[in-house]
Each structure stands twice: as structure tokens, then as C-alpha cells.
């Protein structure tokens, strides 16, 4: 069977600063090197780990695990609160190094990026492997000796990412037509980036149990029988090294969540923080130039229950006041006798903003003009120079979270740091 693998030379390099926040903290604090440690957004009884050092991962401590669970595995586990300016320093250094080799750089997250070498002079005279090793060394020279990155090289974004994860930590590998079949023989379906347990179940139900069987499957079969959408054909191309992932993903929702420092049912503690969450959610809407029609409020209760309410509105909104007004109506319906340990606010059903259109309603115009004026002042002098009194109280309670897995809000976050 002819598999029609992409015959082109690899032109995509994937850079992965794995365990980025934890490694950065170990670089900044030599006493932490070689020790199991992690980073959280705010230290509390219920806080979750957003980054774990290699030493912690080796013990079974994972991202998303609660601090209390990690302590059961390793009583000596060290937890630190996140430090955005520190991570921004490393992020900016990494971006600068990457752009020295090609203008076509795309950061997928704070700790992951892609260099597209197609059409660049650099690749004509030097191998990508040589450039990859040089980038590794430059990061050590320009940031610090403890910094390690994984480098993957491939003909498309997917295979470059797979290659970057092949030999962690500190690996450098290439996947292309010469070694792809042997690589696929040694991995499981869930080792493929994008194939989680639910997709594995679909593949298994269709009689596909190995990556090689996945590779050999007919594209029409994948489309109609397995994924029931064009996603099946995309996987057929992706596995062969053809590019299908160079289109930006559509933004589906924006929001915030907060793990309370202590469980509480007290409105005087909960609502100021909630208003701050709503205000920063409104900022995200405007930052992305979108309006929302739906809003959802979710609460994790001390009893272990999860409570939520959602509402779809006939008209779109984007101002902080409108986000808060709609969300307040929902949170006020919560079971007041139950103590809350975590709050989330989500705006969804997003559409490109129509706020540039002049409204016939004077009150709407006033709200829009006021929001624009406040944003302009805060952009110039720093976030929350102008804000509600409740938000001042709330901001002291809620630490802005590192936008793990995306660079979309990193610039917005640093205005507050």
C-alpha cells in the first residue's frame, strides 16, 4: 500500500520550553534546582498546580493536581505563586531568539512556538538540526544554564510538535518520510497530539487500534465512519506530514475563574471578587474585539457539588457593567446556604464587535463612550487606574492568572503585574 507521505524536506521547527514556569523559577532560585516543585496562581488549600518541575513529574505529580494531593505524594514538594514579569522576560528572550532565524514565528502558547523556515535564506546554508542546537545554546547563554528546550523538526506543524515531545527533556528530533513509519510503530494512539480518550474510543469502535492502522485508513472512511466530519480527512493528511493546522482557531468563549482563599457563603467576600472577575472578562471581550450574547456562572461548592446557571440574551454586550449585571442575576440564584470554594464566569456565543456602529439609544451610546474612555485611561496609565470600588476590593483578593496554554492575554496580564 502506497502511503503517500509528504516527500518535502522539513521546514517547520517546534520549540517547547517544557515545564516552563517551574524551570524559570529554578533558574532564578538555584536552591530549587533538582527539587520537586511547582507553580500555582495563588497558594491556597484548594489551589491547583499549573506547572511542575521535571523532578516533581518523575514522582507522579501532574499539572492540574491540587497542592494537597501533591503533598501526599511528596511531603517535601515546594509550591510557589506565579510571577508573570519573570515569565515574560523568558518569553520575550525566546521570541527574539526565534525571530533571528526567520520572520515567520508563531507562538502557540507562552512556552511553545513555531518557526517556519520555508522561503528563508537561513535554511539554504545551514541544516535545521544545526540551527536547533544553536537555539538551545543561545537560550542558556542569554537566560541561564538551567533552561532547557525541546526542539522538533518536521514537514508540518503536527509532526514538528510530535518530534519535540519524542525525547524529553532537552531533546532535538526530526520526523519525516525517512523515519515516520518506525516512529508510528512505537507509539500509542493517545501519544498523538489531539487524540484524547474520546477520539481513541471512536477509532477503536471503527476497528483502528494502532497508529499504523490509523495511517493506513481510507480518508473517506475516517470522514464518514469515524469522525463524521472533515476532521477525518484532516487527520489523513496530518499524519502524512501535510499541513492542515496553519489556520488560527476561532475564539469560542472568554472568562475567568477564581479559587477562593477560604470557603465562604458571605456576599461581602464573594461579590467584590466576582465583580472584578466580570470586569476582567469584559476586558478580554474588548481585547479580542468581540461581543457576547451568552453568560454562564459556575460554582464549586464545599459539599462537592457543582452548581451553574446560564442565560442567552437577545442582544450582544461587551462592557464591564453589562457583563456584571447579567452575571450578577445568575449568581444571586445560587444556594445561599452552601459555602463556595471556586467561582467561574464565562461569556460565549461570540461575534465580531459591532460597537463602532452608532446606536440610536442615547443610554447605549453613553455606556459605550464611558467604557472606551476608561479603557483609554487604563491603557495609558495602567490597568485599574479607573475602576469600581468593588473591583478594588476584588482585585486585592483575586490574583490574575497566568494564561496557560495561550499567549492571547499575556500582554493584557502584564499591564497589571
Enumerate the predicted regions with their spans.
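Residues that scaffold, gate, or flank divalent-cation-dependent active/transport sites
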Residues: 1-110, 114
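Short acidic, glycine/serine/threonine-rich loops at helix termini
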Residues: 24-27, 50-52, 159-167, 246-251
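Hydrophobic alpha-helical hairpins/lids featuring a short glycine-rich hinge
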Residues: 88, 92-149
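Short Gly/Ser/Thr- and Asp/Glu-enriched loop/turn motifs at secondary-structure junctions
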Residues: 108-112, 146, 153-157, 290-294, ...
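Long, highly charged, low-complexity intrinsically disordered interaction regions
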Residues: 127-187, 354
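Acidic, metal-coordinating catalytic segment for phosphate/diphosphate chemistry
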Residues: 315-417
